């Protein structure tokens, strides 16, 4: 997201980065965050808050890096040569601002030692703030940010204008206005006040409209150029990612309905839902964007990789792997939910928890196979990228001709 946003903002604003040194700090600072997380998490040095596990010194580093990132991004927009700000930059801007607010508010803590702190919130309030953060981290980090990528790379790879620019503007304002209210659906049937749970459910259902508006806008950009899907495997990644986005954003509001949530909560269905977004939407649009960008970094035409057949092979491996992964978790989740709520005539549970785990084993095997296929596809991509970076210029010229 950082790389693509700083690339896109330069091209669409016709301006160089506000500060190359600050951008370099963002890169190396973020690598330090990753290394710090890789060291502290296995040692058990965590806050125990989902998605916000890192302790306070690393949280401060994240804040510094994020502020630098925001300065570079918005500074570049401020010195733009164009009057108009392209819609992709709107989504990136929302992602940067929202994640900053979410991170600071949810990570407020009282340090006890260098490696231990306690949240300033307690009980139900802590849970509410945590899932306001958790849901919107998904909403702005994994949705708004990647929609910014979509609004640039889909029309660019298809060589077509966005289907409806007006729809993209409506999509933007509707999404950022509604998304922030949907967090309570993670806390159905808890000590959270019932009206807050109901508000979260209602906002989640409304959220379906702007989400599908974005999906339709992306897919319909191919109007008049559907034949490109047969010949361009990079475009396949981008369009199929939108299909998974649509599926995931239909499933999310459905799972937010209290009666459905009573069956799905705590089961593998939730894991299937998350990975339809993480593998199907986030990973596949990122892969498509990388296939578009990597040749450009080495002075070639967009999408001009070493082997188009390997991209095609990777596409099918990623798609099949994702489908196996999420379908197995859907089946497991429904089965677990039904087994856990089954009772005998005297009110005792029909199945023990261990029996539900045993019944889930075939699904876990299918998930392992699907994940293995997806991972193997990434090795195919790594090989293709490695060969692309070593293509002699003569071969590049021949491929272009």
Question: Model-found features: residue ranges?
Answer:
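Specific lipid-exposed transmembrane alpha-helices and their immediate membrane-water interface residues
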Residues: 102-111, 182-189, 242-270, 278, ...
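Short aromatic-rich membrane-water interface segments that cap or initiate transmembrane helices
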Residues: 51-61, 123-139, 197-207, 265-279, ...
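Interfacial and helix-entry/exit segments of alpha-helical transmembrane bundles
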Residues: 17-33, 84-100, 158-177, 225-251, ...
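Membrane-interface helix-loop-helix modules in multi-pass inner-membrane proteins
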Residues: 1-84, 110-119, 179-206, 306, ...
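Short, highly charged, low-complexity non-transmembrane loops/tails of multi-pass membrane proteins
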Residues: 393-401
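Hydrophobic cores of alpha-helical transmembrane segments in multi-pass inner/ER membrane proteins
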Residues: 1-4, 60-74, 136-152, 204-219, ...
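Juxtamembrane/interfacial segments at transmembrane-helix boundaries in multi-pass membrane proteins
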Residues: 77, 83-89, 97-133, 150, ...
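Membrane-embedded translocation segments of transport machinery
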Residues: 143, 147, 161-265, 270
């Amino acid at each position: 997201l950082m790389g693509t946003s700083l690339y896109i903002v330069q091209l669409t604003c016709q301006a160089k980065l506000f500060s190359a040194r600050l951008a370099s700090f963002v890169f190396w600072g973020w690598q330090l965050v990753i290394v710090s997380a890789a060291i502290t998490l296995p040692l058990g040095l965590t806050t125990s808050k989902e998605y916000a596990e890192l302790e306070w010194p690393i949280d401060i580093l994240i804040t510094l890096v994020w502020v630098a990132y925001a300065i570079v991004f918005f500074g570049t927009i401020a010195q733009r040569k164009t009057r108009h700000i392209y819609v992709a930059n709107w989504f990136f801007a929302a992602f940067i601002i929202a994640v900053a607010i979410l991170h600071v508010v949810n990570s407020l803590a009282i340090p006890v030692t260098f490696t231990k702190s306690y949240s300033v919130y307690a009980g139900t309030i802590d849970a509410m703030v945590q899932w306001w953060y958790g849901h919107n981290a998904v909403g702005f980090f994994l949705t708004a940010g990647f929609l910014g990528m979509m609004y640039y790379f889909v029309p660019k790879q298809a060589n077509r204008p966005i289907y409806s620019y007006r729809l993209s503007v409506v999509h933007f304002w509707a999404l950022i206005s509604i998304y922030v209210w949907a967090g309570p659906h993670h806390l159905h049937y808890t000590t959270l006040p019932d009206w807050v749970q109901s508000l979260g459910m209602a906002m989640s259902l409304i959220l379906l409209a702007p989400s599908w508006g974005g999906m339709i806008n992306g897919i319909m950009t191919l109007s008049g150029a559907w034949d490109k899907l047969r010949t361009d495997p990079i475009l396949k990644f981008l369009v199929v990612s939108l299909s998974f986005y649509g599926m995931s954003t239909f499933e999310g509001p459905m799972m937010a309905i209290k009666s459905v949530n009573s069956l799905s909560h705590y089961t593998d269905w939730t894991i299937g839902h998350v990975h339809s977004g993480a593998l199907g939407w986030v990973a596949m649009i990122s892969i498509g964007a990388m296939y578009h960008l990597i040749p450009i970094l080495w002075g070639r035409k967009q999408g001009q990789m070493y082997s188009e057949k390997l991209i095609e092979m990777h596409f099918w491996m990623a798609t099949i792997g994702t489908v196996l992964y999420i379908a197995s978790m859907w089946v497991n989740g429904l089965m677990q939910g039904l087994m856990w709520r089954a009772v005998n005539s005297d009110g005792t549970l029909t199945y023990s928890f261990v029996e539900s785990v045993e019944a889930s084993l075939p699904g876990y095997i299918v998930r392992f196979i699907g994940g293995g296929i997806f991972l193997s596809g990434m090795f195919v991509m790594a090989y293709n990228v490695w060969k692309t970076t070593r293509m002699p210029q003569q071969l590049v010229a021949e491929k272009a001709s």
